[in-house]
Amino acid sequence: MNYLFIIDPIEQLKIKKDTSLFLMRTFLKKKLNVYFATPAGISLKETGNLSADVFKIKKITDKAMYDECEKKSLNFFKKIFIRVDPPFDANYLNLSYLLEQHKHSELINSPSAIRNFNEKLSILNFRKLIAPTLVSNSTSDIKNFIKKYKKVILKPIHDMAGNGIFLLKPNDPNINVILESMTNNGLKQIMVQKFIKEIKQGDKRIILLNGNPLPYALLRVPQRNEVRANLAKGGKGVIKKLTKRDLEIIKTIKSFLIENNLNFVGIDVIGDYLTEINVTSPTGLVEIASQANMNIEEIIINELS
């Protein structure tokens, strides 16, 4: 069977930490044929069929070894994993429209679902699971929200890995310049959430495969005096068993994920609150698999192969 991964340039991926490369290694161990392509290599022919400039992976050790580029019809692949990192910009949007034309293979995740469910905004479908949240480009509305909740987190809507996140209080001397910068002087909406104090204990990444969670979450603990727990920002990752509240959140969102063909998702949970639903290229598998006293690879094969 032939599997394709659509990824960012492979030389940009970190061999020891990247989830896409971990998935490729897992499938290679099962003697599956694994290929990769970048968005730039995807084409729609005049016949309506899609093709890609692909590279067949030979092995992944301390580096990825692969064959020369060849052009393949996407019909050649049983499953296609779309794992391009945000931001979800015009190029990503165009990729989703192109891939939506392809009906022959199973696409993980659905291109239309990736397009329709922003990783920050999709939590708004579950108001009872989230902290008080404002989405606005209005400086006055944001200031009133900050005044009400005393301490808030500001997030850009189309970014990842903790980039562009600010902690603000009503008396912050930089409040005006921060709001002007983040909203582009009132032209761009941002997300503002009540600060969740449990972030000091960490931010959990829970991987869901076909709506089913791995038995362990990756708890990312922020550095001292830091509110961003992302590993890319220096957070420390340790695995934890899922709590009763984690399972309640998963049960609530599972049917939504399945109905929208979101087969590979990473949700973020702080304390009792759902904070993000990551659908583009969820990470955390390497850290979970390396610490869990069980065969995570077998679970992945059973759910995704």
Segments predicted by a language model, with ranges:
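ATP-dependent carboxylate activation and anion-phosphoryl transfer catalytic cores
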Residues: I7, L13-K16, R224-N225, K241-S305
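Short glycine-rich anion-binding loops that position phosphate/pyrophosphate groups of nucleotides
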Residues: P9, V84-P87, I157-D159, P282
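Phosphate-binding site of ATP-dependent enzymes
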Residues: S140, K147-K151, A161-L247, L257
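Extreme N-terminal starter segment of soluble prokaryotic enzymes
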Residues: M1-L4
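Short glycine-enriched loops at secondary-structure junctions
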Residues: P111-R115, R220-P222, I270-Y273
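Conserved N-proximal alpha/beta basic substrate-recognition cap immediately N-terminal to
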Residues: E11-V135
